[in-house]
Amino acid sequence: MPCGEDWLSHPLGIVQGFFAQNGVNPDWEKKVIEYFKEKLKENNAPKWVPSLNEVPLHYLKPNSFVKFRCMIQDMFDPEFYMGIYETVNQNTKARVLHFGKYRDVAECGPQQELDLSSPRSTTSERQTFYCVPVPGESSWVKEAYVNANQARVSPSTSYTPSRHKRSYEDDEDMDLQPSKQKEQHPGSRQAGGLGGLHWCGEPKRLETEASSGQQLNTLNLSSPFDLNFPLPGEKGPACLVKVYEDWDCFKVNDVLELYGVLSVDPVLSVLNSEERDASALLDPMECTDMAEEQRVHSPPASLVPRIHVILAQKLQHINPLLPTCLNKEESRSCQFVSNFMSELSPVRAELLGFLTHALLGDSLAAEYLILHLISTVYTRRDVLPLGKFTVNLSGCPQNSTFTEHLYRIIQHLVPASFRLQMTIENMNQLKLIPHKDYTANRLVSGLLQLPNNTSLVIDETLLEQGQLDTPGVHNVTALSNLITWQKVDYDFSYHQMEFPCNINVLITSEGRSLLPADCQIHLQPQLIPPNMEEYMNGLLSAVLPSVLNKFRIYLTLLRFLDYNLSDDITKAVEDDFVEMRKDDPQSITADDLHQLLVVARFLSLSVGQTTLSRERWLRAKQLELSRKARLQQQKSVNGNEL
């Protein structure tokens, strides 16, 4: 069995070793998973693994061990593949068993031929996910992961082979002319496939089919391939992810960290071209639909590489400054949380000061912004999401770049975010809701296909009078449903499918927002900088990177703290509510009490308290009184408009 660092550069060799030892006994599959799991527990081992998020694809060695941080954008139908297949040597008639797991192309040695009728062959099933880089991931998150990755300096991992000088366009060309790769693949190949796994055979046939396949592929690639990213301007690779175990544990929009075998074999493009060609010959009337589905589900490997997953982990968060898993049972995680909680008070005070400056001197608005940024849906009662705290920051300066720069500040604090400029034109034209394309048999992404814990800033300050058309009304309704119910109804043409979410929504507006909000806070600037960009840039440059990192840890960590109300505290709150109603029955309603409890919850968590104290309850009441008084004052100034 290969040893040393071969698990990084030749993972299939490791798999072959276990398969050779165990044969058809399925225990070899469990041993493979356990082997890589143990390898990744070694000191800093995950940092040695090249990441598709950070390393250009053409630097990575085919069939090497890689990782990928991504979101499941779509799930394709399960596919069958040859789990075990048998080859026969044409000269000696010797028979050899091979594994098909973690492969797209079956490997055959010289003079070997695949025996399709072998009784020892087995068919297995795997699931394919279409995965994209995490939408809206902040640049500081990407930079931190790049800086932490040690794969580039690892002497045992070479991903600058002879391919490293080829351009991106050359990669596409290699897909169209796989015969160029013949020397890199000893043994012979034949373009063909069965049950999701392609096999090898006679080399001469490959060359002739490659030339005919080249023309077909050129036609298919004449229009750019849509990588189906939910947000505009996103970069990074999309991947077809082959999952072999426990795929029922994952769902669309989950954020994953994957470890597996990279497959970028150019032969795949030729094989897929042949399948499209064969479909057209069988039924020309249906060839268009089938070709579109084939194009989407089997894009060129140079554009959409394949990852055969050995290990997959659903991520609680993507903040690189925290342990990946915030597990109470894990000592490292507990130690990290304990150490940070001991310095929570000064971090909160500094963050409050920082946000007060960002909000032009308004400390009350800064308090509510902190509560908003640490809020999260912690449970659902029937259809009602508990813990959401959408804030409408009204009173934003008109004809100013304030909202744009405020969003920049938020981008520097949270791991993932997106700013939606709410104009009539955008509402009428943007595709917010994902929809099913039945021709291509895929889920077409929309702007609201976002992973949990994303910060969505909706900027209404650019909204002017105009007419919403039908798509515009649907988009506004989708935003309202997202805010109220924390769900997005994806369009499947014949029906809508509900996708629950956990998105922090901040609405910036001049007057009261057109959209529903849990809390409206009217901004009262204490200063109006003559140059907003210069002011905000100065604010960011004045904060030490170490302090900024503490803000980032603070805002992520507090979302995962448990919070409970004891029976005594619940009784005290109820009694206080009754007393407030006695003094002025009109001053507080059941909805006001619910709002007060939400504010008290996040206020307690913001200081590291996991239950409600009398001090925090009184502070929450004081904040709410100040906020309402400010709204009332603004109402008297502007009439009914807030």
From Swiss-Prot:
This is Mini-chromosome maintenance complex-binding protein. Keywords: Cell cycle, Cell division, DNA replication, Mitosis, Nucleus, Phosphoprotein. Interacts with the MCM complex: associates with the MCM3-7 complex which lacks MCM2, while it does not interact with the MCM complex when MCM2 is present (MCM2-7 complex). Interacts with the RPA complex, when composed of all RPA1, RPA2 and RPA3 components, but not with RPA1 or RPA2 alone. Associated component of the MCM complex that acts as a regulator of DNA replication. Binds to the MCM complex during late S phase and promotes the disassembly of the MCM complex from chromatin, thereby acting as a key regulator of pre-replication complex (pre-RC) unloading from replicated DNA. Can dissociate the MCM complex without addition of ATP; probably acts by destabilizing interactions of each individual subunits of the MCM complex. Required for sister chromatid cohesion. Residues 151-196 are annotated as: Disordered. GO terms for molecular function: chromatin binding. GO terms for biological process: cell division; DNA-templated DNA replication; sister chromatid cohesion. It comes from Mus musculus. It is found in: Nucleus. Belongs to the MCMBP family. The modification Phosphoserine is found at residues 154, 167, 298. The modification Phosphothreonine is found at residue 160. GO terms for cellular component: cell junction; cytosol; MCM complex; nucleoplasm; nucleus. The gene is Mcmbp.
